[in-house]
Regions:
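Anion-binding (especially nucleotide phosphate/pyrophosphate-binding) glycine-rich loop
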Residues: 3-137
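Structural signature of FAD isoalloxazine-binding scaffolds in flavoprotein oxidoreductases
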Residues: 34-35, 41-46, 73-91, 142-172, ...
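Short clusters of hydrophobic/aromatic residues that line enzyme substrate/ligand-binding pockets
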Residues: 19, 25, 31, 92, ...
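Residues in well-ordered beta-strands of folded domains
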Residues: 42, 85, 105-107, 130, ...
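Phosphate/pyrophosphate- and phosphate-bearing ligand-binding catalytic cores of soluble enzymes
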Residues: 20-21, 72, 162-229
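Charged, low-complexity, helix/coiled-coil-prone segments
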Residues: 1, 50-62, 152-160, 212-229
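A gly/ser-rich beta-alpha-beta helix-loop segment of oxidoreductase catalytic cores
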Residues: 113-157, 163, 228-229
Length: 231
């Protein structure tokens, strides 16, 4: 398929404001380095990201799902594929309370630290470990992010996941097969669309103190990274 055709189809799904060509990846990674992506698309709702990925698979286009770009190294020559960013999937809210548990809903592009702040402001404990982790919900679920004795596996109830066949399945904590920095998402190259977490009530001052301590300690840790190369 000609370049202009795939770009036009992506614009038809997402609108011109969400599609760009030769987009500098340095603008979308925490390291602030990296050459251009051939095409960059940032769907602003879940239906659009589903339709975008369906199109790319149908047209046999190489693509990469990008969250916050945390610890991602992009080669200077860029990426000769289509980057699909979750950065516009930002819905975050407290869904409900059930007994001593409170449930939080977060779309894939929500920053993990933002979810941790919402939890702390609502005096909800369990998410303190996430306060200093520079990643998105989608990436955090995919790799079962964690630190200082806490991890996503401890608080996630379920995630809406885009499967290889294009269907969307609500996968439970157990079905996600969360293990140390791994999950079924990574094993099968699936896409996290959103997630639901369950947290308990706690003491706000204790929650904030723990988050501050974890954030300070995290600054001294070595950084690992993923390398995205041009093809």
């Amino acid at each position: 398929m000609a370049e202009t055709e795939i770009v036009k189809k992506l614009i038809d799904i997402n609108g011109e404001q969400c599609v760009s060509e030769s987009e500098a990846m340095s603008r979308h990674t925490t390291f602030r380095i990296g050459g251009p992506a051939r095409v960059f698309v940032s769907p602003d709702n879940i239906d659009k990201i589903i339709n975008t990925i369906e199109l790319l698979k149908k047209e046999e286009q190489e693509y990469f799902i990008l969250g916050n770009g945390s610890n991602l190294l992009v080669a200077d020559e860029g990426y000769n594929g289509i980057v699909v960013s979750t950065e516009n999937l930002k819905e975050l809210n407290i869904e409900k309370e059930d007994g001593d548990m409170t449930y939080i809903y977060a779309q894939a592009g929500v920053m993990l630290s933002r979810a941790a702040v919402l939890a702390s402001e609502s005096s909800l404990t369990g998410f303190e470990f996430a306060g200093g982790i520079p990643g998105s919900i989608g990436g955090a679920v995919s790799m079962n992010a964690g630190a200082y004795g806490g991890e996503i596996k401890d608080v996630i109830v379920s995630a809406d996941v885009l499967m290889e066949d294009g269907s969307v399945v609500k996968m439970t904590n157990k079905e996600l097969e969360l293990s140390y920095r791994n999950s079924i998402i990574q094993k099968k190259n699936l896409v996290v669309l959103s997630a639901e977490f369950a947290l308990k009530k706690g003491k706000k001052e204790e929650i904030l103190a723990k988050m501050k301590d974890f954030s300070t300690r995290r600054r001294d840790k070595p950084v690992s990274y993923t390398h995205l190369r041009a093809h």
